[in-house]
């Protein structure tokens, strides 16, 4: 045997698991595109002056088992104290049926945002359920699904309040002094760029302040007090002030709906509906508003529509509000939200139903009453008489209480003057309450739970009578039917079957990087060492998290060529916002705050101009030339015109046109010459890793889509993570946090998300990916992504012209297929092709972005040659079908393309089409059939007849 022990150990085994084509397939594809090797292909495509001489030093690869063991050892450094800190985060009991069938199920977590509703009806239904939960609990008319976290939702509520306010000259936003501190932090950050003045005061003093356009109240204050704001809201409404209320989703089960009290906007975190704390996230926020404000709402809204056969079908409604269409005029820059977490919360509500939720909420409140009664019986004073689950307990010996708590492995809230905060949750037991008595009173307290229970059961006044909910919630059958595990399992499976995810087929969406989310990468996110930590626990309890985050940040620094990485942003769009704020604050530190012009190429993703607008910048569009590259002449002219007001350029690399622009360094130099900064959008980082880097190219800041390049799954529309990498001069200006000091970050800036490290519990996914791939594997992944894209382009270019290419006719990691000539000749559109691909078992490529009338295809490195060939064969077969239409064999108004997708029920219905049933549903090469459950959606009907709550179950059948 000639192999060495090192070869037999095969530490790089995962590289071959992650990359789809094996060595033989890679060589076949290289031959097809006319390249001798991966290195030769890369050398032809990537400009020589930006190619790295040596790959970033992120270590050797590790096997799945070795990496899991290494990460488990790191995770074990976290200390799992029982946390009663509260502040918007509590421990939960995620029902195992949801854990196994959703959170751990690639049929749910590998799906994409439901832009293609025909292959997304399952998660759209779950999201509609989420909206129904929100509507029932808030008492409002319109809900979205969903936002990034509660603090971000507060900032969105402020922005929305200004949009809808009739007080156009008012510029002040009032925040009640007992909102959560992290919420206030994010609101202040957003207000600064919008030029709003934030006033923080006792809610009852709001009327003392003039020129207020909006008010933020918190129904259950951060230290636990329940407020009856009915009269105050009425007075504010009489003065035309827009009222937003932050609410606790579990408290709303028992408390009066803020919408019934007159609130215009209600929002909060859905975390305690089954989603672990995860050291801060990911968690979905709910958001609701009055019907009259629906077109000013941020985020996705799921609406009920009809398909081509008149059947009920769901879709994302009113998309003209959103960044991918309205760009800088959008209501928000939100793209990725928190769909997977919203769906967990919605299914938590389905599983427990109204009776179960009331039992949980009442049990939490009863235990809180028992704790309060015992403490008061022993002479301790509560700061608030009215509470749901949180007590603010005044203590004489605070240091002693905290010391006893630490000894008992308990976290209390400690930042309240002369008091401690205690928040109970659904995991709290009577034994926990007895332990809390010992911490606060000493071991010889003599209290008995059952005796206290009898007392409070007959005389609880901790919720005001006027604040008790008097209406029914969750009356729709979906919340009253699936309470056995068998029924719940089958319901979830019925939803999953309606959707197309990566566990069934390639999702070739350009600019989305739908690559493998390996099982080994996903396993650690449910480890209790990661899942159960409170984001505001003492840092010494989170040493495992700190080590993992620091190591991941170090790897990302090396891979990007930057000097520092900030992990706080919760999505790519939020990363853009954070990076632009860093640029803004950098200019201000140099007394150049007047620099507010952001140059953006015409091809940019819609989040770019939307984020620039949010950061207080003016957007100036830079033209692209006929080859899709940034027009340098126009860039110089626009930069010179901006002059001393130039803030930055936002550029994507490789470009959204799917090519490595030869002049990217010159672009950076022009902007720097005029005093601007270069923001390089990290959306296409999958074509850079190991080959080049933003820092090496000359950029100053980038966000990284960890849910693209670094394998966090898309979850059907979230979660995501968008950390930013920065050069040293921008490092002091990345987001900070008002509650937690971020180690190693010397920043004085406000936060952009509620938790200091964003959605920290999904960072292990990216850690595992980098650890298992190593430097060698990461570079190879980028190279194979490029190879796969060029293979598709070369095989399809005769049937569907590739719109933009670089040197030697090559593309980067994605290609744009131009459908416009075919449409002119035949009337068949890119939409028809996209829908016909469903019949062939594929999700559509990205439609009409960045160029109308095109399809953008990104195969990623994870797809094998077999799957690529299946996609290519499907596209060629569709081209042959188009030729049949062109030849007059099938009429334009009745052919397999314009009628696509076809559903099962059509097979047994009367058939009057000029093509066979077999052509319709089993076109050439289709063996493993995916069946959509609805035909093509009627978008116009959906927006003209907006309906965004649950419909009768019979409508889905």
Curated annotation (Swiss-Prot):
Q: Which Pfam families match?
A: GcvP2_C (PF21478), GDC-P (PF02347)
Quote a single Gene Ontology cellular component term.
glycine cleavage complex
| UniProt catalytic activity | N(6)-[(R)-lipoyl]-L-lysyl-[glycine-cleavage complex H protein] + glycine + H(+) = N(6)-[(R)-S(8)-aminomethyldihydrolipoyl]-L-lysyl-[glycine-cleavage complex H protein] + CO2
What Gene3D superfamilies does the annotation carry?
Aspartate Aminotransferase, domain 1, Type I PLP-dependent aspartate aminotransferase-like (Major domain)
Please name the InterPro entries in this protein's record. GcvP, GDC-P_C, GDC-P_N, GDC_P, PyrdxlP-dep_Trfase, PyrdxlP-dep_Trfase_major, PyrdxlP-dep_Trfase_small
- GO molecular function annotation: glycine binding; glycine dehydrogenase (decarboxylating) activity; pyridoxal phosphate binding
Q: Which family does it belong to?
A: Belongs to the GcvP family.
PANTHER family named in the record: GLYCINE DEHYDROGENASE (DECARBOXYLATING), GLYCINE DEHYDROGENASE, DECARBOXYLATING
What is the name of the protein in this document? Glycine dehydrogenase (decarboxylating)
Q: Which organism is it from?
A: Escherichia coli O127:H6 (strain E2348/69 / EPEC)
Q: Which gene encodes it?
A: gcvP
């Amino acid at each position: 045997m000639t192999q060495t022990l090192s070869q037999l150990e095969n530490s790089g085994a995962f590289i071959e698991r992650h990359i789809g084509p094996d060595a033989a397939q890679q060589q076949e594809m290289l031959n097809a595109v006319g390249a001798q090797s991966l290195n030769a292909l890369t050398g032809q495509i990537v400009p020589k002056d930006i190619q790295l001489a040596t790959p970033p030093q992120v270590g050797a690869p590790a096997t799945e088992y070795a990496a899991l063991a290494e990460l488990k050892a790191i995770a074990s450094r976290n200390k799992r104290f029982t946390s009663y800190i509260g502040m918007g985060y509590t421990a939960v009991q995620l029902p195992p049926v949801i854990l196994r069938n959703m959170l751990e199920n690639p049929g749910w977590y590998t799906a994409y945002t439901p832009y293609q509703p025909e292959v997304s009806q399952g998660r759209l239904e779950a999201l509609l359920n989420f909206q129904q939960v929100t509507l029932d609990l808030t008492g409002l008319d319109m809900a979205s699904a969903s936002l990034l976290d509660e603090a971000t939702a507060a900032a969105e509520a402020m922005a929305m309040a200004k949009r809808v306010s009739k007080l156009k000259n008012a510029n002040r936003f009032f925040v009640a002094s007992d909102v959560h501190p992290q919420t206030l932090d994010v609101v202040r950050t957003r207000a600064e760029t919008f030029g709003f003045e934030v006033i923080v005061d006792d809610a009852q003093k709001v009327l003392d302040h003039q020129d207020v356009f909006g008010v933020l109240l918190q129904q259950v204050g951060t230290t636990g007090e329940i407020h009856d704001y009915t009269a105050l809201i009425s007075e504010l409404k009489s003065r035309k002030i827009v009222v937003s209320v932050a609410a606790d989703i579990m408290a709303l089960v028992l408390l009066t709906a803020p919408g019934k009290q007159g609130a215009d906007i209600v929002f909060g975190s859905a975390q305690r509906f089954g989603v672990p704390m995860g050291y801060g996230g990911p968690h979905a926020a709910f958001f609701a508003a009055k019907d009259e404000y629906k077109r000013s709402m941020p985020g996705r809204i799921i609406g009920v529509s009809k398909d081509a056969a008149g059947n009920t079908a769901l879709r994302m409604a009113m998309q003209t509000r959103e960044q991918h269409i309205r760009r800088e005029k959008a209501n928000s820059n939100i793209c990725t939200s928190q769909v997977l977490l919203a769906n967990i919360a919605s299914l938590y509500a389905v599983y427990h139903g109204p009776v179960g939720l009331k039992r949980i909420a009442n049990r939490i409140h009863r235990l809180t009453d028992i704790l309060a009664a015992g403490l008061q019986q022993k002479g301790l004073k509560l700061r608030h008489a009215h509470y749901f689950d949180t007590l603010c307990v005044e203590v004489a010996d605070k240091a002693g209480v905290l010391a006893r708590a630490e000894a008992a492995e308990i976290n209390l809230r400690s930042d309240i003057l002369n008091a401690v905060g205690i928040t109970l949750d659904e995991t709290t037991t009577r034994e926990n309450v007895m332990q809390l008595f010992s911490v606060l009173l000493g071991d010889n307290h003599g209290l008995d739970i059952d005796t206290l229970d009898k007392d409070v059961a007959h005389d609880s006044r901790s919720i005001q009578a006027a604040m008790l909910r008097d209406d029914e919630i969750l009356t729709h059958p979906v919340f009253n039917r699936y309470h056995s595990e068998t029924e719940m399992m089958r319901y979830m499976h019925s939803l999953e079957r309606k959707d197309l995810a990566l566990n069934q087929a390639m999702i070739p969406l350009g600019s989305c990087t739908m690559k493998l989310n390996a099982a080994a990468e996903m396993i650690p996110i449910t480890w209790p060492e990661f899942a159960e930590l409170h984001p505001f626990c003492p840092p010494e309890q989170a040493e495992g998290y700190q080590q993992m985050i620091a190591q991941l940040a170090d790897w990302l620094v090396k891979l990007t060529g930057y000097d520092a990485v900030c992990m706080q942003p919760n999505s790519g769009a939020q990363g853009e916002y954070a990076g632009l704020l860093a640029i803004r604050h950098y200019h201000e530190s140099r007394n150049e705050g007047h620099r507010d012009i952001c140059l953006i190429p015409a091809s940019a993703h819609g989040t770019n101009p939307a984020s620039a607008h949010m950061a207080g910048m003016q957007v100036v569009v830079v033209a692209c030339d006929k080859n899709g590259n940034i027009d340098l002449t126009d860039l110089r002219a626009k930069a010179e015109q901006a002059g001393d007001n130039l803030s930055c350029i936002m550029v994507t690399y490789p470009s959204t046109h799917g090519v490595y622009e030869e002049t990217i360094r010159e672009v950076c130099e022009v902007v720097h010459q005029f005093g601007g900064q270069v923001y390089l959008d990290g959306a296409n980082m999958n074509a850079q890793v190991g080959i080049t880097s933003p820092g090496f190219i000359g950029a100053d800041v980038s966000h990284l889509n960890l849910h693209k390049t670094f394998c966090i799954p898309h979850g059907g529309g979230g979660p995501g993570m968008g950390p930013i990498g920065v050069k040293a001069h921008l490092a002091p200006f990345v987001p900070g946090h008002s509650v937690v000091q971020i180690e190693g970050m010397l920043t004085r800036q406000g936060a952009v998300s509620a938790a200091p490290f964003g959605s920290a519990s999904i960072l292990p996914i990216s850690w595992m990916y980098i650890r298992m791939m190593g430097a060698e594997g990461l570079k190879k992944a980028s190279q194979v992504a490029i190879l796969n894209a060029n293979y598709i382009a070369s095989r399809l270019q005769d049937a569907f012209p590739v719109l933009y290419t670089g040197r030697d006719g090559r593309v980067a990691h994605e290609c744009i297929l131009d459908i416009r000539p075919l449409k002119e000749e035949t009337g068949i559109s890119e939409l028809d092709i996209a829908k016909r691909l469903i019949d062939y078992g594929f999700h559509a490529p990205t439609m009409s972005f960045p160029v109308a009338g095109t399809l953008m295809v990104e195969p990623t490195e994870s797809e094998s040659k077999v799957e690529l060939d299946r996609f290519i064969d499907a596209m060629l077969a569709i081209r042959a079908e188009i030729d049949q239409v062109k030849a007059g064999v099938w009429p334009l108004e009745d052919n397999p393309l314009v009628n696509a997708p076809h559903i099962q029920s059509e097979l047994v219905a009367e058939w009057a089409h000029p093509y066979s049933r077999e052509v319709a549903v089993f076109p050439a090469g289709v063996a493993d059939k995916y069946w959509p459950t609805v035909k093509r959606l009627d978008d116009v009907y959906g927006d003209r007849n907006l309906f965004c709550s649950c419909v009768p179950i019979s409508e889905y059948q």
